[in-house]
Amino acid sequence: MEPIYRPPPTSGRAVHVFDMEREAWRGTPSPGFWMKPVRHDDQQGLFLGLIRFERGTRSGIHQHQGIATSFVADGSLTDYNGPVNLHEVGINYLGSTHDAVAYRDTILVSRLEAVVTYPPEGEITGVHAGSQHASVRNLEPDRPPEINVAIDSLPKQPTGIEGVLRQLIFDYEGTGTNHRMVQLWVRPETAFEFEAGALTEFWVRGGLASFNDQPVHADCFVICEAGARVKVRSPYGVLLLAWAEGRESGAGNLFGF
């Protein structure tokens, strides 16, 4: 599937804003699955964007070969471990094996960081970038297939920047990568700056702000390439989900490295 954004071979140190309200839902080869892909790389299984399940749609049995994080913006998904509910983040890890069903129309804000495998006898559905057939066996049957996090109940932590609080959703411990996923609460009349130490991405959950004078609102993605100098202004407050692949340089510690 053709994405909206393709990362350059070397960082251009740019900041890109994508207004998903302006993007049409794109059908996949599997009925009932729709996407708005910001990034979509089938070779590496990398994805950033929105995924929509129509009511009654199943993902099919599959196994994650790395981290996938999904915020439930609307609806819910259920597998053998139970549901991931509205406004929770479901975290899949290397070896997560499950079949998820939507009992209601569901929208996910998703970031995939590795390919997903389906058993040879199974159908590959259109829900995952980098899907391929391979032998699938759950080698850790006592481990749940996902970690479900009620992110709004997490403690708020200071970031060292006045007007910005952090809720640490996932620190990637034990995954072999040193990334972070957080929620940032930005108070009205707040302004701050940082330099992205590595790829850093945001989804605007609510409120208004600007990134390098580019206005953003609810359901916008922001991609900050490595080395980008980023100026954030929020006169009215903003709530952000963020994924950082490395620590930023700046006055504080936004992402909890």
Model-derived features: positions:
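A short, N-terminal "cap"/entry segment at the start of jelly-roll beta-barrel domains
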Residues: M1-Q44, E121-G176
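Glycine- and acidic-residue-biased ligand/ion/polar-headgroup-sensing regions
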Residues: E54-R55, H64-D79, P188-N212
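Conserved hydrophobic/aromatic beta-strand scaffold that supports enzyme active sites
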Residues: M35-P37, L48-R52, T69, V89-I91, ...
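Histidine-centered metal-chelating micro-motifs
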Residues: T57-G60, T78-D79, L86, G90-D99, ...
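Fold-core signature of tandem repeat domains
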Residues: I169, L184, V216, V222, ...
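Ligand-binding loop in jelly-roll beta-barrel domains
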Residues: F33, P83, L94-G122, A198, ...
